[in-house]
Amino acid sequence: HVFTNYNFKNAFEKKTFGKEIVSFAANANKKEVTFWNEFRPVPLTSEETTNYLKKDSIQTIRKSQVYLDSIDAKGNKFNFLKIITGYSYKNTHKKWSFNYQGVTNIGSGSFNTVQGYNLDSGFSFRKWNDETGKYTSISSTFNYGFSEDRLRVNGRYYHRFNNINNAYISVGGGSAISQFNPNEPISPMLNTIATLFFKNNYMKLYNKEFAEINYGQEVVNGIFASGKLLYENRRALLNTTAYTLVKNDDLYFSNDPLQPFNSASVPFDKHDIFK
């Protein structure tokens, strides 16, 4: 079709155009065929009709429970080795998944002079809704230090309400071991190598029992606001091991960065913080 005799407007009022570039009406992609036949300005060609029918059939199959279950079954296979390496189970049709981290993933094991060798693992459960954008996750993390002989456990709940303003709430708590610098600039792997092979125990750690709640959302287009309430009970820790793979007369520094040569020194007293 060729269109001619366009009518162009030479000028528009100042408020004719807003910041909105494009918008979609709710359920715009859920209309029946009769709706499109009534409002479509140009009828579909036979080729277009055939193409849409083919794509609709493929989409129907790929969204069917039989098809989705068959795809999930390949990734959901379990064997006893996965108890060590980790395991994931997914139900795409019902939109949920479960994950176990295992204990042999990269980063799950490390070494520091406070805990000695330590392992991380955990579980997580996710539930989502593609139509509304809702998303919920529940996760837990376990950390055990062999020289320290202590297990630390913490958990977190996260819920996103929609994908319009991406409003979310997050609640967490438990016990954890943390670096003095909250940004945790020293990676566990780097510290493990530096400690075991060069006796440079850079990472300084403390224990925290904590509870926190976070909320955030997009308040206006492009501007996101969030808030956080946090409680922590902080306690200083001491080195519990002098183990190393390098045999020499060098000694480890203490876990107090202010008095590195005093192994019994603690950098701060036990205290609580709210922020």
Q: Could you describe each region identified by the protein language model?
A:
Residues 126, 141-145, 172-176, 212, ...:
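Outer-membrane beta-barrel pore domains and translocons
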Residues 31-115, 122, 185-275:
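Transmembrane beta-strand segments of outer-membrane beta-barrel domains in Gram-negative
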Residues 1-29:
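Gly/Pro-enriched, hydrophobic low-complexity segments
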Residues 164-166, 171-197:
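Periplasmic POTRA and POTRA-like interaction domains that precede
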Residues 104, 129-131, 146-150, 175-183, ...:
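Gram-negative outer-membrane beta-barrel proteins
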Residues 119-129, 151-172, 213, 217, ...:
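Feature captures outer-membrane beta-barrel proteins of Gram-negative bacteria and organelles
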Residues 129-137, 163-169, 222-225, 235-236:
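Repeated loop/turn-to-beta-strand initiation elements of outer-membrane beta-barrel proteins
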